[in-house]
């Protein structure tokens, strides 16, 4: 026959196991343990934060929220990528996780895996936006 102390210990252990399982389920549902997520806000034609750090070779999910009443874009890449988009006439981007259109007052989610350590810019190349300061930087850490 179990003593009251053993029963309390057993109940406490059972409760601890259930609580641990519940916390693990919540953490998994919240995305903890999944790919890193970085939120970038667009307000007054500026990116916040204007600099982020990511690990090389790991998928990173970016949630880009446009709080402005005008459209923007988020182009991430090296100088060659940025130069291409500066001279490109296509303001609508579909299917490329490193070049996304962000309509006014909406959010867009994209996932990017950076394969080389270093620095890349994220810029909005819609007319006048880069000159106004819509530029940010990604530092890709080894």
Task: Name each model feature, range by range.
Residues 14-24:
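Bacterial N-terminal signal peptides
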Residues 76-82, 126:
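Short, compositionally biased
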Residues 32-59:
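N-terminal edge beta-strand
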Residues 3-15:
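Bacterial N-terminal signal peptides that target proteins for export
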Residues 80-90:
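Short aromatic-acidic-glycine turn motif
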Residues 46, 98-142:
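Extracellular/periplasmic metallocenter environments
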Residues 51-75, 107-116, 120, 140-141:
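Beta-strand cores of secreted/periplasmic/IMS beta-sandwich domains, seen most often
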Residues 27-31:
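Boundary at the C-terminal end of the N-terminal hydrophobic targeting segment
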